[in-house]
Amino acid sequence: MTTESEVATSATAAREKLDAHTYETVQWHFHESTGSPFWLEKKAGLNFDPLTEVKCFDDLKKFPLFEDEWLRGGPVRRWVPKGMDGQPTYVFETGGTTGIPKSRVVIDDFRIDYEMFSHTLPDEYFPKGANWLMLGPSGPRRLRLAVEHLCQFRGGISFCIDLDPRWVVKLIKKGWMDHLEEYKKHCIDQAVTILTAGHDIKCMFTTPKLLESLAYGLAERDTSIQEVGITGIFSGGTEFTPQWTRFCVEELLGGPTEESGVY
């Protein structure tokens, strides 16, 4: 049984680790030799010196609030730290439904995040070496590359469909629901074609709504998610309630919740 003193000791150690990480991060981003042009320019307008006056997590309160609008437009290279010059750089974007999309510069974080995530996946449902289907947004999206890397990190090959979420939003705004339904069918048709082409795909990522549509699309062809060989499903991106999870597992996948490969 954990004692009160052990909890206090753990909390103190965690706090010290957080403070050290904060200090290291601020030193990196605001130092002339490693910082990005954006943060070095912001540093000049601050009424304090981040390099000498930010020593712990609480000191971050000295900074003004971050403004989302800073992420719209370019030049996007202003976000690349000098300490990362020369490394392959990716740009991921938001939906862009309210004007210029917000951009995010990424070098390695999606790889790091999903390699850590990989260690949480049960091999029983997500076997090492298995091929994956990415049934989700394509284009300048972090998620697509992240799932692809997750699959590759686990020794598999990732198959993707073309899905433009910006077009989906436009169809909804215009009230073109018939067009929306046809576009959804177009996306599901791509997925069904891949799953029934003999690629030995066992795992997939998709959103809850697309997962449901895929199940119905396969049923129309007299097959099912289980019959095409899927054993593990990583799903997210939109609301995923306990009630829907139960419906998905028991009705769409045909199994009890406690034995499901839905993650």
Language-model regions: role of each:
Residues 1-93, 99-131, 136-140, 144, ...:
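Nucleotide 5′-phosphate-binding alpha/beta core
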Residues 2-28, 49, 152-263:
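Active-site glycine/GP-rich loop and adjacent strand/helix microenvironment
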